[in-house]
A protein has these predicted regions:
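Short beta-strand-to-loop acidic/aromatic patch adjacent to the donor-nucleotide binding site
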Residues: 92-104
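Conserved nucleotide-sugar donor-binding catalytic segment
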Residues: 146-226, 230
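Cell-envelope/extracellular polymer assembly enzymes that use nucleotide-activated donors
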Residues: 9-11, 38, 191
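Conserved donor NDP-sugar-binding/catalytic core segment of glycosyltransferases
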Residues: 108-141
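Glycine-rich, basic loop-to-helix element that forms the pyrophosphate-binding segment
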Residues: 70-90
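A conserved acidic beta->alpha catalytic loop
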Residues: 43-54, 72, 100
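Short, acidic, metal-binding catalytic loop of nucleotide-sugar glycosyltransferases
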Residues: 28-37
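N-proximal low-complexity "stem/linker" segments adjacent to membrane-targeting elements
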Residues: 1-29
Length: 273
């Protein structure tokens, strides 16, 4: 295992499972000073274990990459927590960012987010607006959210304001050992972001800094019912406003009975690119 004695701006945490083309696509979109960040890839039991040779076939060798191998497929929550625990042991970064295989960043994403957190010490967690795109049909829609902390806190009762691959948060916000909760299957990020917001403010940069791949085999589609049930549990546990909590749970239960293709059509008609 490498050691990273010098201070860096951020670690970029990416879970990986049998998707080398998607991983390389994502890594090629990252633009930042190579000396100031490290990519941490957690291979969640791929059929062919990921190697540094695989990664460096597609990106510059100047970029620092750490691959953590899990012996078998443990699921995204375990993969993410394994990565976070490794990062915590290093103790040499100001921030942690996320990206998923297949998603891509605007050239200034990380420069903007690092600067934002440096300039706003009360903010623990920053995300951005994003575009969801189906690369097979080229259908796309915008994901637009409130940007200021007070409205974010209210809106979190109804949906996860922070799209996972868009976020960056302070390393120091996890000093109590916070990890992704394993009690909310397919919505671990929702619970994790609520934990971070208990310790500081959240913010959204109102620009499309990430394009997220719509994966019709992914969690959000194939396990939608389980995800919605987990989101209900998150709102019940973390929501602090009784009225908003009730309304948020009502909305999520309504989504349980609406077919996803109807939801997708509505999103496309309202927010289509």
């Amino acid at each position: 295992m490498k050691s990273y004695p010098h201070k860096i701006d951020f670690y970029l945490l990416i879970p990986f499972f049998n998707n080398l083309p998607g991983l390389l696509h994502s890594l090629r979109s990252v633009q930042y000073d190579a000396d100031k960040y490290t990519v941490v890839i957690v291979d969640d039991g791929s059929s062919e274990p990921l190697t540094l040779h695989d990664v460096y076939k597609g990106i510059s060798r100047n970029i620092s990459v750490e691959i953590i191998q899990l012996p078998c497929n443990k699921g995204i929550t375990t993969a993410l927590n394994t990565g976070l625990q490794w990062i915590e042991k290093q103790g040499n970064a100001h921030f942690i960012a996320r990206l998923d295989c297949g998603d891509s960043c605007s050239p200034d994403r990380f420069t903007r987010q690092v600067a934002f957190l440096q300039e706003n010490p009360s903010v623990n967690l920053v995300g951005s607006w994003c575009i969801f795109r189906d690369h097979t049909t080229n259908v796309a829609y915008r994901y637009i959210t409130p940007t200021m902390h007070k409205k974010i806190k209210r809106s979190m009762h109804f949906r996860n304001i922070f799209i996972h691959p868009t976020v960056m948060w302070r390393f120091d916000a996890m000093k109590d050992g916070d990890l992704y909760p394993d009690t909310f299957p397919d919505a671990e990020d929702y619970g994790f972001f609520y934990q971070l917001l208990k310790k500081g403010e959240g913010a959204i940069i109102p620009e499309y800094l990430v394009t997220c791949e719509i994966n019709h085999k992914g969690i959000s589609l194939s396990s939608r019912k389980k995800q919605l049930q987990s989101r209900i549990k998150v709102v019940k546990e973390y929501g602090r406003n009784r009225v908003l909590r009730y309304l948020g749970v009502f909305k999520l239960r309504l989504l349980l009975i609406i077919p996803y293709n109807i939801v997708f059509i509505i999103k496309k008609s309202l927010y289509g690119v």
